[in-house]
Amino acid sequence: MKITRLTTYHAAPRWLFLKVETDEGITGWGEPVIEGRARSVEAAVHELAGYVVGKDPARINDLWQTMYRAGFYRGGAILMSAIAGIDQALWDIKGKALGVPVYELLGGLVRDRMKTYRWVGGDRPGAIIQQITDYRALGFDTFKFNGTEEMKLIDSARAVDAAVVKVAEIREAFGNTIDFGIDFHGRVGAPMAKALLRELEPFKPLFVEEPVLAEQAEYYPRLAASTSIPLAAGERMFSRFEFKNVLCAGGIGMVQPDLSHAGGITECVKIAAIAEAYDVGFAPHCPLGPIALAACLHVDFVSHNAVLQEQSIGIHYNEGADLLDYVINKDDFHCVDGSIAALPKPGLGVEIDEDMLKRANENPPDWRNPVWRHSDGSIAEW
């Protein structure tokens, strides 16, 4: 079998899908994208095509290493996202060719179902209590929301209180019947992160995500020493080498690589294994589309330390399409009590409505994250 063609499709709300075709008629799907940089990743995908077209798709490890190492300059968000999407598609092809789900190729199941959580609120979160109430009726008991809006490097007690009051209201409304993670989203500098963690500790969040930016990873062990709240990070880390350094330094209780950013299935299986060696949980980042979610689930199902899976049904970003709109076999992704069962179909187990996707590609989205500014006019972290 040989790879013959790579085709990319843009689709609302902010996704890029990749179709990899072979001379035997088996096709694989991937989702290579950086939110807000889809066209940059698309260009990288087609640049990497020269390494894979004409090659045997079964040699996933060799193709991955070639895409990563053949260029003198390597790594980073764009290139690793392009590799990720191609890698996902190669695993999809291999599973379909052999008639088994990808998790069987990775050694088989360690669990029968994977617990997921729901996003509530938005960039500037509001109506969180009502959303949690609605989702609890659907069987979900674990949630995540943004913890702050803009926050200066050194900010006021008012800014801290605003974040804490919101969390207090949620805990008061639901008691300990729910769990929630709080996403600092890299908006908080190290000095304020320490203050916020101290004030949030009485409300027992499940985790705090991106307490500081990945560029400030040296603060993870210092912050962890000041709180009992597990710290999570990793959506803006793109290889096992970055995770290696963070895990060696300590401080992180849960790693969150993105299967569409951090080299795909091949790389993230390794990241999960390294994290397990450090007794650190694995909870892939995935506010993206169905192929990305399917890839995450296959790694979750073979990773003993997988604890939670993010998924984007109803997320505030999904304007123009929701998670399963381009999926034919929607029932395979159905959540029961907040968990998804092992996907039964060969490959990644997601059947894409290609006709719908082609129509979406005729009017491609141009999503960009908001640009925020502080009251003094300086740019703020979104």
From Swiss-Prot:
Known cofactor(s): Mg(2+)
Sample GO molecular function, one term: galactonate dehydratase activity
The keyword Acetylation appears for this protein: no
Enzyme Commission designation: 4.2.1.6
Sections of the chain in a coiled coil: none
Enzyme active site: H185, H285
Residue numbers spanned by region Disordered: 361-382
GO terms of biological process kind: amino acid catabolic process; D-galactonate catabolic process
InterPro entries: DgoD-like (IPR034593), Enolase-like_C_sf (IPR036849), Enolase-like_N (IPR029017), Enolase_C-like (IPR029065), Galactonate_deHydtase (IPR023592), Mandel_Rmase/mucon_lact_enz_CS (IPR018110), Mandelate_racemase_C (IPR013342), Mandelate_racemase_N_dom (IPR013341)
Enzyme class: lyase
Site (Transition state stabilizer): E310
Site positions for Increases basicity of active site His: D258
Reactions catalysed according to its record: D-galactonate = 2-dehydro-3-deoxy-D-galactonate + H2O
Additional detail: Reaction proceeds via an anti dehydration.
The protein's role, per its UniProt record: Catalyzes the dehydration of D-galactonate to 2-keto-3-deoxy-D-galactonate.
Protein known as: D-galactonate dehydratase
Name of the encoding gene: dgoD
